[in-house]
Design a protein with these regions (language model features):
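Unusually extended, aromatic-enriched hydrophobic runs near protein termini
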Residues: 7-8, 30, 81-85
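Amphipathic, interaction-prone secondary-structure segments
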Residues: 17-59
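Negatively charged, low-complexity tracts enriched in Asp/Glu with abundant Ser/Thr
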Residues: 1-27
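Context-gated lysine
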Residues: 2, 10, 41, 58, ...
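Acidic, low-complexity intrinsically disordered segments
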Residues: 64-119
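Extended hydrophobic/Leu-rich segments
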Residues: 8-11, 22, 34, 54-55, ...
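Intrinsically disordered, low-complexity regions of eukaryotic proteins
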Residues: 6, 25-27, 37, 68, ...
Length: 119
């Protein structure tokens, strides 16, 4: 599933309220070396009232970063000098929270101001 910048910003703006996490497996098309990557958001283990945004780009942990703000997370030049904003159109989401990305993204992207609709 492709994800653009607006989708990623909305996904990672979802309030965790001190519990749970968002975990995204992804690849970056046309950028060798970024085939099995992870990014996410969770409560900061040391300060549960704060959120921690993170990347894990290599399975061996050599390219792993934590950020305390969405701005820093989105604008860190960790993809060969490019930011998540720069490469957002190349992001292919493989899973969200270990499930089908199209299904799970609906939960995070749903506008909570809209009334709940039943089929």
């Amino acid at each position: 599933m492709k994800a653009d910048r607006a989708t990623l910003e909305k996904l990672f703006s979802y309030p965790l309220d001190g519990w749970g996490c968002i975990e995204v497996e992804f690849e970056v098309t046309d950028m060798p070396g970024y085939e099995n990557c992870w990014m996410g958001k969770m409560p900061d283990p040391e300060h549960q009232e704060q959120e921690l945004f993170w990347f894990g780009l290599k399975p061996d942990g050599t390219e792993a970063w934590d950020y305390h703000s969405l701005f820093d997370f989105m604008s860190a030049p960790i993809f060969k000098g490019k930011t998540l904003c720069d490469i957002s159109e190349k992001i292919n989401v493989l899973s969200v929270d270990g499930t089908d990305p199209a299904e799970r993204m609906q939960f995070y992207l749903y506008d909570r101001k809209d009334p709940i609709r039943f089929a």
